[in-house]
Amino acid sequence: MVRIGETFYLSSVEVSRPTTRFSAPRNGFDRDPGAGVGHLFHFDGTGRLLREIPLGEGTIYHPGGIDFDGRWLWVAVAEYRPESRSIIYRVDPETMQAREAARVNDHVGALAYDRSEGMLHGASWGSRRLYRWKVRGERLAAVGPARRNPSFYLDYQDCHGVDRQRMLCGGVSSYRLPGAAGGVFRLGGLELVDLARGAPVHQLPVEVSTPEGLPLTQNPFWIERHGDGLRGWFLPQDGRGTLFVYDILPRSASRS
C-alpha cells in the first residue's frame, strides 16, 4: 500500500477458485495455480474508491506489496504459489496506466524502491530470496543472483524503501502450537533491512492486533514521518476491512 498526498493505492486479489494442494509435488509445484483477478485500487481516506485497474494475465493474478519511486508505482503480480512466475509492472498514478517492466521466474511477493541507488528490490514467497533490479528506462535489469534472506522471523507482505539503502518490511509468521489442542499463533512485525547486505538490521515484533485477533501487519501498511515520530496506516483484514491509523512516538514522548 502507498499513500500519495491524501489518497492511497492498494493492490488486491480477487480469488475465484482457491489453490488446491497436491498430495505430492507435480512439476516442482506443491499446489495448482487456482484462478482469480489482480486489482490495483485508488481510494481516499474515507475508503471511497476513486479508480481501479486489473493486473496480471492467465494464472498470474496475485499482486504483492507495492512501492512508489516518486514517479511510478511498482507492482509485482505472481502466480498464487511458491517457486512460480511473476510480472513486474510500473503504473502511472495519475493515469493508472500499467506497463510491463520485467518477468521473473519466481513468485515475487513484495517490492521496495531504493531512491539513492535507483534500484528496485523484491522478496520471494516466504521472503526466502531477495532480488535486485536496476531501472533502465522502461525495463528492469537483474543485478546478480538472488540472495538468501538470513532471517526466518517474518514472511514479508509489504515493503517500502527508506533512507540510506534500507527498506522497511511488514509481515507475519504463523506457528503451530504444541499439544493436543493445537491451534496457530500468528506473530506480526516490522523489519528494517540493509539492502547492501541483504539482511535485517533491526526487528520489531508488533503486538497490536485487530478486534478479531489478526496481527496489524498481516497485510499492507504505509509508514511516514509525522511530527516527532511516525504515523502508520495498516489494512490487515482480507475482504472488507478497516484502515487502522496509529501514531508511533519516541519512548520518552509516549511516557509523558
Residue ranges and their predicted role:
Residues M1, G58-G65, N105-R115, S151-G161, ...:
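Repeated scaffold domains used in trafficking and secretory/extracellular systems
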Residues F43-R48, V91-M96, K134-E138, L195-G198:
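Short loop/turn segments that connect beta-strands within beta-propeller blades
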Residues S11-A35, A78-P82, G171-L187, L243-Y246, ...:
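Short, conserved, GDST-rich strand-edge loop motifs in beta-rich repeat architectures
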Residues G28-R31, G38-F41, I87-Y89, R129-Y131, ...:
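A short loop-to-beta-strand structural motif that recurs across blades of beta-propeller domains
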Residues G5-E6, G70-R71, S116-G118, R164-R166, ...:
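Short coil/turn segments that connect the beta-strands within blades of beta-propeller domains
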